[in-house]
Amino acid sequence: MMTSVGEPELQVSTDGVVTLKPPRPGDAERLVEGRDEEFFRWLGPGAETPRPVACVWVGEELVGWVDYDVEHDWLRPGEVNVGYYLFPAAREKGYASRAVELLLQHLSRETEHTVATLVIDRENVRSLRLAHRLGFVKRGGVEKGLFFAREV
C-alpha cells in the first residue's frame, strides 16, 4: 500500500454511489481481511497495517481502498502513481472506476499534481479496462508491467 507523506488529507467525497473516506480505526484490519489471491498476484504481499489515502465505501459497506504516492524514481515532476483494490464481492460493478475518478478529482482540486500514472501487469485485464475507460494513455512498459498516464 502506498503513502503520501505531506499530502493534503482527502475529505469525504462521493459520486452518489461510491464514497471515499479517510481510513478510520479498525479499517486496516478489514482491508487485510479483504485480500484474496488477486491482491497478492497483482499487488504483492501488501503492508501488515495498510494506511491508504482513502477507503472505498458503497453504502455502509467497506469494499476496498484507493491510494497514491510520489516516491518513485520513474515519476516525473508533478506525477503521482495511483493504486486501488476492491474486495472480490465489489468487483465488476464499476466501483473501481468510480473510486479512481473520485481520487483523481481530489488530486486535481487539492494538490499540485498534474498527471496520474498507473502501472498495470499485462495480464490484469480488469485494470487494463479501467485505464482505458478513464482515459489513461499507455506511455510504455516498465519492469512490473505497462505504464499509463493521464492528466488529473
Could you describe each region identified by the protein language model?
Residues 1-38, 53-152:
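Acyl-donor (CoA/ACP) binding surface of acyl/acetyltransferases
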Residues 41-50, 57:
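A short, aromatic/hydrophobic, helix- or strand-capping loop or linear motif
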